[in-house]
Amino acid sequence: MATAPTITDVQVEFLHFPAVVTSPATAKTYFLGGAGERGLTIEGKFIKFTAIGVYLEDKAVASLATKWKGKPSEELINTLDFYRDIISGPFEKLIRGSKILQLSGTEYSRKVMENCVAHLKSVGTYGDAEAKGIEEFAEAFKKVNFPPGASVFYRQSPDGILGLSFSEDATIPGEEAVVIENKAVSAAVLETMIGEHAVSPDLKRSLASRLPAVLNGGIIV
């Protein structure tokens, strides 16, 4: 796979996203596809709340290159299928959501769940199993508090496992706090971040600008 010297880190505000990370929970190594801020415009001012980094298993390179190698960033950023292939691709994703401003777990998860449920209903995949998965998601965040710099990690496996872990900083925990077994719910989390109604256009731009070099030659410039 591409290694640390050939992939650049990303800095979002005071939050550092390393080029390559290894999860002690899975013993797998992931490279940084992209990272960006998420915020809201409140009374005419854009307030940054979180920074999101999407890490990909090395299998992602061959999987995505089949269709997207040679495509320029300008084309990818406007192509929903590119992001959908990241979301649904047969490789693991590790998503880090770190807080710029303090949020309670309930405050943070409420909006994530609203967006996920809206997406699942819009595509007709919200049933009893998904409702149960969303309930498990809500429960996982109830006792969590996120001071600035604290993180949630989402591990998404190709077979539909969504593993959640929480950290006071950017350190990946050795064990996952919760495992949710629902493929639709797992995919919806990343869909809301980089899909059709993405909460982080900045993250989409980062993925589109960085991944072409990886797909073309294994190097991010």
Swiss-Prot record:
Keywords: Flavonoid biosynthesis, Isomerase. It holds the Pfam family Chalcone. GO terms for biological process: flavonoid biosynthetic process. Substrate binds at residues 50, 115, 192. Pathway: Secondary metabolite biosynthesis; flavonoid biosynthesis. InterPro entries: CFI, Chalcone_isomerase, Chalcone_isomerase_3-sand, Chalcone_isomerase_bundle_sf, Chalcone_isomerase_sf. It catalyses: a chalcone = a flavanone. Gene3D superfamilies: 1.10.890.20, 3.50.70.10. The keyword Protein transport does not apply. It comes from the Eukaryota. Its EC number is 5.5.1.6. The record marks 108 as: Important for catalytic activity. One of its GO terms (molecular function) is chalcone isomerase activity. Part of the biosynthetic pathway for all classes of flavonoids, a large class of secondary plant metabolites, many of which are brightly colored. Catalyzes the intramolecular cyclization of bicyclic chalcones into tricyclic (S)-flavanones. Responsible for the isomerization of 4,2',4',6'-tetrahydroxychalcone (also termed chalcone) into naringenin. Belongs to the chalcone isomerase family. This is Chalcone--flavanone isomerase. It comes from Phaseolus vulgaris (Kidney bean). The gene is CHI.
